[in-house]
Amino acid sequence: KMAKEKKLKSYGDRQYVPHVLRYYSFGRIPSGIGNGAIVQVALTQEGNGGTTYWSWYGFQKRVSWCACFTSWCADQCGYIESGVIPKFSLCSDGVKQFQKRKQFKDGSYVPAAGDIIFFDWGENGTIDHVGIVESVTKGTVNTVEGNSGDRVKRHSYPIGDNRIYGYGVPKY
């Protein structure tokens, strides 16, 4: 009704939820709580396939989509538009962008929720995969990852696992 009165096609702000979610950031708390907004967005996607994420990024056909998923989650929180997290579709580009910002830590770092975790499965220096840190408990980093068996899944790894290449540590 309001849109019609104003002679508009629609009324409202499509970015309302991402704008609001930005204010639910819990900061960098040493307890491992970190930033909860991006984690909550990621958890709502558990079990989903990749079409939403790679098509959102602009790809016309299926690609390896773990980085697209991570960027999509950041976008839902308004973190790409605000510059908190860089948009990337390649894991190696994500690492480079966090390094350029001086927001990258190696695999020995103890992360917090909302940090971006990068993997080197072959332990050969190639960054193969990326996910979002959900939490850290008792020496274990818990993650939400896209394109894990072609689904969004949760995983756990020991802190310092040799397959963890490092972490992007956004300034929320």
Locations of regions flagged by a protein language model:
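...with weaker cross-activation on analogous glycine-rich loops/strands in unrelated enzymes
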Residues: K1, G36-V39, I80-D150
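Aromatic- and glycine-rich peptidoglycan recognition patches
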Residues: M2-I33, E123-Y172
